Amino acid sequence: MKQHTLQLEGVTLDVPNQNLSSNEKYARLINGLTADFKSGNVYAFMGTSGSGKTTTLETIAGLVPSGSRTGGRILVDGQERNPDEFPYEFAYGDQLGYIIDELTVEEFVYYYVVSSLPEESKERVREKMDEVLENLLNIGHIRHNKMKNISGGEQKRANLARTFTKMLLLEGELKVVLLDEPTSELDAGLALKLGEFLRDYARRSNSIVLVTVHQPGAELYNTFDNLLFMNNGEKLYLGPSRDFIKFLGTKGIHNDGGPETNMEFLFSLFTKGSKMSKKYEKQLEQIAKEMNEEKKEEKKLRTSDDTEINFIPNLYVSFQMAIRQIIIDWRNREILYSLAMPIAMALFLVTGKYIYKDFSIATIKASMLSLSLYYVMNPSGLMNDKHYVTEESNRKLYGAAEVWFSSLISDTLVSILKYCIFFGIIYAFGLISMDHAFLGQVLMYTLGGTVSSMLFRSMASPLSTLGKVFNTTMVLMFQLSGALLGAGALLGALTLWISVIPEGSIPQEEIDAFISNFFDSTGSTGSTSIFSKVGSWVIRFICLVPKVVRSFLRILFLMFHPFAFFHSSILDAEKSSYKLFF
């Protein structure tokens, strides 16, 4: 089995300074960290709070705060990390995690894994998920409970179940496992069980397992092969975990309390202002000096905004996200609440007809426009700033392209449902007949409202995933604007022509007369006759486009209109008198 290596070479991380009392633009969290890790071993990252252990783990995973500066290199098997291969080479589970209230534990784990590994079969995903829930984490009995109805410790285990399921699916292929405090909030017995599982997994899968821990008990500590102890963003020790106390002894630092107090001694030693830190202040300064001498020359820092964005979505992942979102919105009644507006609007029109005895198609069209504007200002689903979308996209579970496409799918389906209810009510009360079909405008309003809402939210939050895509798209549009200006103007003109001019409103005789008068007035003779012929054909083509497009839209209407199958005359498209645009 091939051996894998993970190398950190002078890794440096500066993040935007949040300290308002400081004039420094950046705060350094990792300072020239160099370390080598080998497969088949479990490495514990330890240190006091703020020492940089979690930040180092996140940096290895590529989770760098926006606007940060980075330096150094992170190599896997001697090569820079490949973003496309990251989901299949790395597994990352963080300390805080997140929950999705309306999903069950089983759904929470399942949708995460299938989005992360779309090529895996559903059967195999469920098999490994069952093994984790039932045998490893002991939460099989709550698998059908909603996430919001279980305890904090159970939510912690549900988050772990996602990472552990992925680990089992990629056993033998996974190169690096990153876990941020997986044993926190767990009882000692389960924590020890997980420690032993990670040690065994590293051996049989030949993976590099990196785990942050705060203050483990002696038994859990003994399950770790090696230790990286950090202080103030710097490496203090990297080597066998059992030898750390001996290492400190060689530097003149001794624990007089015995082996059973080693953990308390270590954290007292590196807590600023404590009795032990004052006692061994000079020795600690000497250790830090020696470690600084190992650092390589610091290279130019890069900004974290230099990130490529993939504009091609994974269709399977997008559909899974859309399905999950529809389930969530149905269970939290968001879909039901959103139906109130079209129902109210339809009933308002019905009331108006019977009170004022007057009604026009324009009133329905105005109501449709009002509904579309309402949906733009009151988005639902994935477009409504869902926290878990940010969390999952930050973890590279999917990209911005999948977010956009899944948003389009889920919100479009729900919007079509709303419009169907709207039309169903006014049709039932006789406000419209089967000769009035609005499919073209429904599609335009639905897609226009959905896309507009996404753009508005992207502009409002430029540092969000959607915001970055929007900004990148705008840059590309400006770069291509010169080449596309003519084509865009022509397309806009054709669209306006199709939308505004009804079919048959311009008789063929008038078109012929217009062409003849136009070219006669320009004095086109002799050498300009070719121009006259070409120009006449162009105008004829423009006048023909609305008919072609309307024929295509009629086919769509026959396929998708909710009342189509209840009306016999639609079976003959040539005889139908439906007008998709008014």
From Swiss-Prot:
Taxon lineage: Eukaryota, Fungi, Fungi incertae sedis, Microsporidia, Unikaryonidae
Membrane topology value: Multi-pass membrane protein
Keywords noted in UniProt: ATP-binding, Membrane, Nucleotide-binding, Transmembrane, Transmembrane helix, Transport
SMART domains for the chain: AAA
Domain ABC transmembrane type-2: 316-519
GO molecular function, a single term: ATP binding
Annotated transmembrane regions: 335-355, 359-378, 412-432, 436-456, 482-502, 551-571
InterPro entries assigned to the protein according to its UniProt record, in alphabetical order: AAA+_ATPase, ABC_transporter-like_ATP-bd, ABC_transporter-like_CS, ABCG_transporters, P-loop_NTPase
Matches recorded under PROSITE patterns: ABC_TRANSPORTER_1 (PS00211), ABC_TRANSPORTER_2 (PS50893)
Protein's recorded name: ABC transporter-like protein ECU11_1340
Subcellular location: Membrane
